[in-house]
Amino acid sequence: MVESVVKNWQGEQVGQKTFELRVAKETTAAHIVHRALVRQQTNARQGTASTKTRAEVRGGGRKPWRQKGTGRARAGSIRSPLWRGGGVIFGPKPRDFDLKMNRKERRLALRTALVSRIDDLILVEEFSNELSRPKTKDLVAAFTRWGAEPESKILLILSEFPENVYLSARNIENLKLIAADQLNVYDLLHADKIVVTTSALEKIQEVYNG
């Protein structure tokens, strides 16, 4: 059971909200979060790097000079890895870096990562109605009132993206918007401050507590 203060648009405390997210045991928490983080980063790799071996490089079928009598070192192909333009020894080949992780484990890692950041989590009321029109300056001022400095890395979690909020937020350099049902471990751990709306928190409990 976790309790967090709820702030309004002006940055004033207007109540408290209790929420419950099942997390990993203390002995295994770091391990499961680390596994989820490694999985996310490795799965983002393209794995398309490729080099040619001496068998794949064009040419080199003819022996460049006879074996003996020239005074030069013996050579069997101009595509030897020792030659410029030759094949590559043990170079990269296309491969699949994907790591498997059960959905239950992934969700457990997400919940554990989120709860571990409770000291940096700022819970706010819905504020889309406070922005009568898209205005980055107003949203930056709101973050400051909430205790999240605009220079810091901020993760803003919303249940949905109203156009005025999206347009106000997209030009803030260190801000990342994410939907409540699209969370990932890297963003939760990477942010300095995590700002969550009350409706987004309810959606997180609904989606990830299953």
From Swiss-Prot:
InterPro entries: Ribosomal_uL4 (IPR002136), Ribosomal_uL4-like (IPR013005), Ribosomal_uL4_dom_sf (IPR023574). Residues 41-71 are annotated as: Disordered. Residues 41-52 have a biased composition (Polar residues). The keyword Magnesium does not apply. Keywords: Ribonucleoprotein, Ribosomal protein, RNA-binding, rRNA-binding. The keyword Cell membrane does not apply. GO terms for molecular function: rRNA binding; structural constituent of ribosome. Residues 60-71 have a biased composition (Basic residues). GO terms for cellular component: ribonucleoprotein complex; ribosome. One of its GO terms (biological process) is translation. PANTHER family: 50S RIBOSOMAL PROTEIN L4, LARGE RIBOSOMAL SUBUNIT PROTEIN UL4C. One of the primary rRNA binding proteins, this protein initially binds near the 5'-end of the 23S rRNA. It is important during the early stages of 50S assembly. It makes multiple contacts with different domains of the 23S rRNA in the assembled 50S subunit and ribosome. Part of the 50S ribosomal subunit. Belongs to the universal ribosomal protein uL4 family. This is Large ribosomal subunit protein uL4. It comes from Trichormus variabilis (strain ATCC 29413 / PCC 7937). The gene is rplD.
